Swiss-Prot record:
Signal peptide: none annotated. It comes from Allorhizobium ampelinum (strain ATCC BAA-846 / DSM 112012 / S4). The lineage of its organism: Bacteria, Pseudomonadati, Pseudomonadota, Alphaproteobacteria, Hyphomicrobiales. Belongs to the RNA methyltransferase RlmH family. GO terms for molecular function: rRNA (pseudouridine-N3-)-methyltransferase activity. It is an enzyme of class 2 (transferase). This is Ribosomal RNA large subunit methyltransferase H. Keywords: Cytoplasm, Methyltransferase, rRNA processing, S-adenosyl-L-methionine, Transferase.
Length: 160
C-alpha cells in the first residue's frame, strides 16, 4: 500500500524539514518489507480568501483534486480519535492486508479542515488535544509512520 501526505502550506528549509525527511526516508527504506511504500508529500498553497470558512472550502477543493483514485483518507483534526501508536499501526496494517492501494494522510491549513471534507474522511485522527504548529505535526506524523512500519515488522524501535 502506498502512503502519501497532503498538506496545506509549505514547510520551509530548516531543521524541521530535515527531521521530517529523515523519518520519511527511514519509512521508505523499512516499508517495502512490510508491503508499504511512501509515495510523496504533496504541499498545496494556502487559500488567500478573506474568511475562514471560504479558505477551508477552497483548500478542501484543492485537497480533493490532489487525491489519487479511491484512496483511504485519514484526516488529522483536533476532533479526531486519539489513538496510540499500536492502534495506528494496526489500522495501517489491516488496510494494507485488505488490499487498499493508497492511503493519504491530510493536514489542513491554519484554519483546519473543511467540515464536509472532514466528515467524508475514512478516519479522523488527532495527535493530541493540544494545538501544534504545522512543522511539529509533520515531524510527529513522519515519526509515527516510521514507528508503524517498525511495529508491523517487529523491529525493536517501538517499545510498548
Amino acid at each position: 500500500m502506498r502512503i502519501g501526505i497532503v498538506a496545506v502550506g509549505r514547510l520551509k528549509a530548516g531543521p524541521e524539514k530535515d527531521l521530517v525527511s529523515r523519518y520519511l526516508d527511514r519509512f521508505a527504506k523499512a516499508g517495502p518489507a512490510s508491503g508499504l511504500e511512501f509515495s510523496r508529500v504533496n504541499e498545496l498553497p494556502e487559500s488567500r480568501a478573506s474568511n475562514s470558512a471560504t479558505r477551508k472550502r477552497e483548500e478542501a477543493v484543492q485537497i480533493e483534486k490532489s487525491l489519487p483514485d479511491n484512496p483511504l483518507v485519514v484526516a488529522l483534526d483536533e476532533r479526531g480519535k486519539s489513538w496510540d501508536s499500536q492502534e495506528f499501526a494496526t489500522y495501517v496494517g489491516d488496510h494494507k492486508d485488505r488490499g487498499r492501494r493508497d492511503m493519504v494522510i491530510v493536514i489542513g491549513g491554519a484554519d483546519g479542515l473543511d467540515p464536509d471534507f472532514r466528515d467524508r474522511a475514512d478516519l479522523v485522527l488527532n495527535l493530541g488535544k493540544m494545538t501544534w504548529p504545522h512543522q511539529l505535526v509533520r515531524i510527529m506524523l513522519a515519526e509515527q509512520l516510521y514507528r508503524a512500519v517498525t511495529i508491523l515488522s517487529g523491529h525493536p524501535y517501538h517499545r510498548s
